[in-house]
Amino acid sequence: RFFHRLGAWQVDRTIGSTAGEAAILSVYGAKLGPAPQDFARAGLILVWGGNVHGNNVHLWPFIEEARRNGARLVVIDPYRTRTAALADEHLAINLGTDAALALGMMHVILREGLEDAEYIARCTTGFAELKAQVLKEENAPEAVALATGIAAETIVRLARASANAGRDGRGPAAIRLNYGIQRSQYCG
């Protein structure tokens, strides 16, 4: 009765996931990411903050299909999950530094002019302000490496791979954001 009075019966999934879903909705305009079958066509798959192998079993066969077709699987997670163990690369990021890593990757992409300028002009607002913030030295890979525990060279390589996915003759990048990112301070 207590939770009913609070309106908790109206929560989309769980109280913990609702905040993240509201944030995603405000930024992307939709709560859902790519359909699981879309991952089969990816050239680079980033699993960020989750154990897909154990917790998204419906997605795993599509990731396996993509890998059979040459896709790389990179897991960004402080924990060595089963998914991380099966990945081509596991980036064991320091707890609570996911946002810093994302900003570091964006810094590289914008500094090197790897962004999709046509898409940005057509589909976004506020990009000039975002770019000014992202290009600050505090978001440079060398600074981000100190916070995240991920080498600056790795941040640069991952940013370039993400930006160039789909341009390299293989499929585009597909990112699976999971709830682990929103469940600690300073995360994405």
What are these regions (language model features)?
Residues 1-188:
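Cofactor-pocket helix-loop regions in the catalytic cores of large enzyme subunits
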